């Protein structure tokens, strides 16, 4: 039996994101990397709920903190093994129907901005993996302008 996230779990994620948003970059990256690695190892349904909670929690940050936090999240995900990274991408794709449309669009925009900071080869690899993740999830790939 998979334990899905409760309201309390979502609040814990929200509190963690708020706290980390003000942390020094090195500490933020370390903590976010540990968290996404842990989430990548969760059972599928729980992983989707964890990713959803993280995306929603980040969306609640003030605008000055969102972009840097998304950059940190992408850096953490890029540091995972290919299997863990794909698990996170598939979970993000599967979370799309459960996210408010404005939150999903904003998150997608920040992901694209963050990925553009990487060399072209890494950008292409990320986008190829993301396309595969959406195909695996059976969810239409959003516009990535």
Task: Name each model-derived stretch.
Residues 2-145:
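Short amphipathic alpha-helical interaction elements located at domain edges
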């Amino acid at each position: 039996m998979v334990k899905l996230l409760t309201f309390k779990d979502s609040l814990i994620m929200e509190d963690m994101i708020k706290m980390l948003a003000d942390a020094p970059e090195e500490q933020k990256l370390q903590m976010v990397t540990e968290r996404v690695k842990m989430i990548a190892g969760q059972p599928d349904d729980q992983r989707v709920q964890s990713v959803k909670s993280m995306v929603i929690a980040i969306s609640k940050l003030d605008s000055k903190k969102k972009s840097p936090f998304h950059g940190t999240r992408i850096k953490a995900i890029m540091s995972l093994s290919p299997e863990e990274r794909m698990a996170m991408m598939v979970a993000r794709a599967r979370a799309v129907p459960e996210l408010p449309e404005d939150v999903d669009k904003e998150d997608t925009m920040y992901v694209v901005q963050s990925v553009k900071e990487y060399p072209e080869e890494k950008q292409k690899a990320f986008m190829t993996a993301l396309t595969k993740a959406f195909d695996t999830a059976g969810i239409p790939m959003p516009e990535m302008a």
